[in-house]
């Protein structure tokens, strides 16, 4: 009997300590407790990933983990299976047995409680005047994106609530222009979706760097009044692709009724501060406060591959990210994941 210990690069992978009987058929058995709670017909569950190398001809294997048991097909080479177990509230040691013909592998798997993560996917169209094209050239496209968002809301009205399409208008410029030029029917559709919470209006006119002065930044918030005169709620500011935000906004936002700030950082030519998302009360010199979330990159969802239609890859990357958050002692169980298209994308793909 040979005892092996497998370590993961992420501290929260919870790899089990394995006692493996050497055999020509089954070998290199590993276990991994996934860092998430799943909803299923059996209630809340956790999943244990079992990987095993099979050196013989294709056959079947019986996997027993605790009280759960099932048969799977074995192929020559590497095999990966996921076993669903009831959610645990305390750390438990579960026996794992793999049986294929006369071959048998046994070990213990440590299953620890995991967080009830909530990851909010924030879909938006990133606005990058100058990097893409001039504002006169791209305005028509940004107005069209709002039309598309309204159509997608209509198309998913009969979906379960968690699956209904939702959209965030990253900056106020395009929405302000939309209210000036679109037909009354379209404006009414937008108002209704904002009222329902299906479309969120952000309040910053653009993603500003350090060049504008305080008077310019104060004047840039005029669309907030325009939105509210049209009966549309606007309580969040988004600052994407520019690391940091003008200090004067801490005063302006509070006075204008903006309650939240979300910052999607940029790490290509600038340093991303801190090693994980942060939440804090941004306090102005006069003592006014706005709740601020410093998120990851403003297209983090694209890094996860959500736009590729490869859900298995997307899930694996999200799980790896949750492992990282555990390892970095992220203190909350809610995360925001920003995702977008249009920034340098082909028009037909936007």
What are these regions (language model features)?
Residues 24-343, 350:
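Catalytic-domain carbohydrate-binding cleft regions of carbohydrate-active enzymes
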Residues 19-21:
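Sec/Tat signal peptide C-region and signal peptidase I cleavage site
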Residues 1-2, 346:
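Generic N-terminal leader/processing signal
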Residues 2-9:
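Bacterial N-terminal signal peptides that target proteins for export
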Residues 14, 346-347:
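Short stretches within intrinsically disordered, low-complexity N-terminal or propeptide regions
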Residues 9-17:
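Bacterial N-terminal signal peptides
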């Amino acid at each position: 009997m040979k005892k092996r210990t497998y370590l993961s690069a992420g501290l929260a992978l919870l790899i089990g300590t394995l006692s493996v009987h050497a055999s020509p058929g089954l070998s290199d058995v590993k276990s991994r407790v996934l860092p998430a709670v799943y909803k299923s017909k059996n209630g809340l569950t956790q999943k244990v990933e079992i990987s095993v190398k099979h050196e013989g001809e294709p056959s079947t294997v019986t996997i027993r983990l605790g009280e759960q048991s099932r048969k799977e097909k074995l192929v020559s080479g590497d095999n990966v299976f996921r076993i669903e177990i009831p959610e645990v509230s305390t750390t438990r040691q579960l026996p794992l047995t793999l049986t294929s013909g006369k071959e048998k592998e046994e070990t213990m798997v440590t299953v620890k409680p995991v967080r009830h993560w909530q990851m909010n996917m924030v879909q938006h169209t990133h606005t990058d005047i100058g990097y893409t094209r001039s504002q006169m050239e791209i305005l028509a496209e940004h107005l069209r994106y709002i039309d598309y968002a309204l159509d997608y809301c209509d198309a998913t009205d009969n979906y379960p609530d968690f699956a209904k399409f939702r959209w965030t208008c990253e900056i106020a410029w395009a929405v302000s222009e939309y209210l000036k030029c679109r037909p009354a029917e379209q404006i009414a559709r937008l108002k209704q979706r904002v009222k329902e919470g299906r479309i969120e209006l952000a309040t910053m006119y653009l993603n500003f760097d350090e060049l504008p002065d305080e008077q310019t930044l104060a004047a840039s918030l005029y669309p907030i009044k325009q939105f509210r005169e049209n009966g549309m709620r606007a309580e969040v500011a988004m600052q994407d692709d520019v690391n940091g935000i003008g200090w004067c906004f801490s005063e302006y936002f509070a006075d204008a009724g903006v309650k939240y700030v979300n910052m999607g950082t940029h790490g290509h030519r600038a340093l991303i501060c801190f090693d994980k998302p942060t939440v804090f009360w941004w306090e102005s010199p006069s003592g006014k406060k706005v709740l601020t979330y410093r998120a990851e990159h403003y297209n983090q969802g694209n890094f996860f591959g959500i736009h590729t239609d490869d859900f298995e890859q997307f899930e694996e990357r999200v799980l790896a990210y949750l492992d990282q958050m555990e390892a970095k002692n992220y203190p909350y169980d809610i995360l925001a994941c920003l995702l977008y298209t249009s920034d340098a994308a082909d028009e037909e793909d936007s």
